[in-house]
Amino acid sequence: MLIQIPNVLTPEEVRYCRQRLESSNWVDGRVTAGDLAAQSKLNLQIPVDSEVAQELGEFILTALGRNASYHSAALPLRVLPPMFNRYEGGMTFGTHVDNAIRTVPGTGGMRIRADVSSTLFLTDPDEYDGGELVIKDLYGSHTVKLPAGHMVVYPASSLHAVTPVTRGARWASFFWAQSMVKDDGQRTMLYELDLTIMEVRRQLGDDKDAVLALVNHYHNLLRRWAEL
C-alpha cells in the first residue's frame, strides 16, 4: 500500500525546517546504511545525534501526532526519530531494501521492527531535476515526487531507489514505524475500511445502525490483528 498524505507540514513549518538544516553540518549518508545498501548510496545526512536532528525530529513527530491520515495508514506503535537527507550534484541511492530491525538512538540498544517507511519532502519538485523516489511492488514501479510538506507512506519491505539529482537539491525527512499491525495486507484492509466508514458517516450521519456495525467490524479486526 502506497499512500500520499498532503500538508503534513505547513509552508511556514517547511521554511523553518529548511532554515535550521541549511546552517547544519551534513555528513556522508552511508554511515546509516547496511553493508549492501551502502554500496549504492550517495547522499548527505544530518547526524542523528545532532541538536538540530533531535529538535526537528520532535517537530515532525508533533506534526504526525495531529495527522489522522498517517495514523489510519500506518497504525503506528512506535516511530523512530525522523532523519534528514540531501541529494545534489548527481547524488543517488540505487535500488535497495531497508533493514527489517532498527535500533532506536539513545535507548541503549532498544530495537523496533521497521514495518512502514515514510518520506516527507522538504523541497518542491521545481527546485530540482531527478530525485524521484521509485518504489517497486507486485504491480510494478511507482515514481513519487511530491510538493514540500507532503509525505508518502509505503511498506518497508518494498524495494526502492532515489534517481540521480541532476539540478538543484532534494531535501527530505525519512523515518520508519513499527505498526500495531505488521502485515501490510491487513493494514491495507483496515485503512480502506476506515476510509469507507468516514464516507458512510458523511453520507448517513452517525446515528445509523450501519455506521455502528462498520465501526464495530473495524475494531474487532484491529483487536484480532494488533500486536502491542
Swiss-Prot record:
HAMAP family: Hydroxyl_YbiX. Binds 1 Fe(2+) ion per subunit. Its cofactor is Fe(2+); L-ascorbate. Residues 78-179 form the Fe2OG dioxygenase domain. Keywords: Dioxygenase, Iron, Metal-binding, Oxidoreductase, Vitamin C. Fe cation binds at residues 96, 98, 160. This is PKHD-type hydroxylase Rmet_0838. GO terms for molecular function: 2-oxoglutarate-dependent dioxygenase activity; iron ion binding; L-ascorbic acid binding. Pfam families: 2OG-FeII_Oxy_3, PKHD_C. It comes from Cupriavidus metallidurans (strain ATCC 43123 / DSM 2839 / NBRC 102507 / CH34). NCBIfam families: PRK05467.1-3 (NF003974), PRK05467.1-4 (NF003975). GO terms for biological process: DNA damage response; intracellular iron ion homeostasis. PANTHER family: PKHD-TYPE HYDROXYLASE YBIX. Its EC number is 1.14.11.-. 2-oxoglutarate binds at residue 170.
